[in-house]
Amino acid sequence: FFDFITLDDGELPVELLFEAVCQTELVEVQFKRTFLIENNQVVYKNNTTRHDYKQAEVGTPDYSDLLLDKYISVIEIANPMHSLWSDGRWNKLTMAHGCYWGKCTFCDISLDYIKLYEPIAAKILVDRMEELIAQTGENGFHFVDEAAPPALMREVALEIIKRKIVVTWWTNIRFEKSFTAD
């Protein structure tokens, strides 16, 4: 059983949910893309005028209070991709909000979290990588984009080389001509 389910970008929906749960006054509570129980019925609320945060504003994940060395590594199933995702620990980041391509017929490109393409600057991404390495001691990164932008991947790689940091990183891609042997 769940009391609330939020959809898509999570920062603002979770912030509003926190405010709603902590609310002690009788004022209209605002939600963003949230399912909840109201009068014994599941209802969808999207009654805020606030906009989602820009990707450059969301900051770096903070794992400082987690005992990362106490977590077990679990391989979910024999699928090699699931093994890659689950075996060991990967710091998770996003290169871009939305999709740079936006033309796949299997994807619902009408959804804001897909159609509103907003890449993060390579410098900011590598800053975040360095913060996570310092915090977690782990230098493996999984960029969780559905399809990472090739031009941005190149910029990130060049920024990593420029800073002389040693990392392992991977992401999902769309195969296209912009990829070179370089």
Residue ranges and their predicted role:
Residues 42-54, 107, 156-162:
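Short, charged low-complexity intrinsically disordered segments located at boundaries
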Residues 1-52:
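Glycine-rich beta-alpha loop elements in corrinoid/cobalamin-binding modules
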Residues 48, 56-60, 65:
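N-terminal export/ancillary region detector
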